[in-house]
């Protein structure tokens, strides 16, 4: 990723947001709800990462919603004619939510500069991946959206 790219991570993405520039101090201030938390002044839930100057969008709690946030950011990038991308990350369980499908469909129809990364955790809470999707690979879902 490069400067100006936008990311919409999910709550398990501590390693990703650290790579994107969040510090251990940033994470601890957020986790302990401290006033100096750069994301929200201590008002956001733990693991709801954001850092504006690094292009990390704030997230909402329901899984899968980071997809539509990322797709919206990709639409803004396209409208502004910028050379950047937007990326959203989800677990395989989130890829079964309506926000995931609606977001990918919109991104595909409008040919947006959007990347979706699905982290296959093998279980969505208590459901094994063998009972979550019928495709051989999760990436095969992109074909249906013209990606």
Predicted regions and their residues:
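Cofactor-binding active-site loop characterized by glycine-rich and histidine/acidic residues
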Residues: 1-110, 128-134, 139, 144-146
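A short acidic, helix-capping loop that chelates divalent metal ions and anchors anionic groups
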Residues: 124-126
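Short, proline-centered helix/strand-breaking motifs
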Residues: 113-114
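Short, ordered loop/turn segments at secondary-structure junctions
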Residues: 12, 119-122
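Active-site flanking residues adjacent to catalytic metal/cofactor-binding acidic residues
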Residues: 91, 118-119
């Amino acid at each position: 990723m490069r400067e100006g790219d936008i990311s919409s991570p999910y709550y398990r993405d501590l390693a990703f947001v650290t790579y994107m520039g969040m510090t251990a101090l940033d994470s601890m201030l957020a986790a302990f709800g401290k006033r100096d938390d750069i994301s929200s002044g201590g008002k956001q839930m733990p693991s709801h990462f954001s850092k504006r100057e690094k292009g990390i969008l704030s997230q909402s709690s329901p899984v899968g919603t980071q997809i539509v946030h990322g797709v919206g950011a990709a639409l803004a990038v396209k409208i502004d004619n910028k050379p950047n991308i937007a990326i959203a990350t989800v677990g395989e369980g989130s890829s079964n939510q309506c926000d995931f499908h609606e977001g990918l469909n919109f991104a595909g129809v409008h040919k947006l500069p959007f990347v979706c990364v699905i982290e296959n955790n093998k279980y969505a809470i208590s459901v094994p991946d063998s009972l979550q999707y019928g495709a051989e690979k999760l990436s095969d879902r992109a074909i249906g959206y013209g990606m």
